[in-house]
Amino acid sequence: MDDTSFLLDWPRGNVTFAFEDFGGEQTSVQGLDRDVLSMRSALLGMAPEDDAAGKASLTLSVASHAAGVALVRFLYLGNYTIEGPDEIHDPQFLIHAQVLHLADAISCPELAKLAMGQLNYNAELAVSFPASPADLVQTLIFVYTHLPHLPEALSTMLNYCVASFTTHKLSEDADFKRLAGTHDSLLSDLSKVNAERGFGKYPPPSLRTATT
């Protein structure tokens, strides 16, 4: 997801996006064209400031370098995923939650819609796989921490957990059990979704005992 080789097909510009992730690590993507950036985000096209040498830069706070590169892919290509439309891939959640967070931060509804669509798609896809994606717990933590104002993201993740709780043996997953046992509202939120899906007012025994 962090491959920038697609930029080789475009004229080189003078704009650099500097990315700083939540851990303070800094990376960058150079050679961006201001006119291309402006086509999908007038804000990001205007925001980079020129220096005396005629070079422009903009620093963005991102959850990961991959999320920053995903933004650049979207600005250039109109999408940020690498897979073709008919290509089946292993589902993953975290990158799409991170891109959604970035899209919200820069007020880019088109990118936010794409990211939310990818999160929904991967959640639906993951149910048919034999095990849950490795980034499930990381994504739950990220959504609760950074996207509480976007309820659709949390709803998507909770519905996946309820739908696959038994088949993916989440009650036996050490990381999931640890999160369920320490998080303020995960179990109660899962119980609400369980009831909304018509599985009863209370969670199944495996869900009630997820922390044991």
Q: Model features per residue range: what roles?
A:
Residues 42-56, 81:
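Cytochrome P450 catalytic domain signature, combining two hallmark sequence patches
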Residues 1-36, 62, 66, 73-94, ...:
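N-terminal BTB/POZ boundary and linker segment
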Residues 33-45:
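Short helix-loop-helix/strand-helix junction enriched in hydrophobic and basic residues
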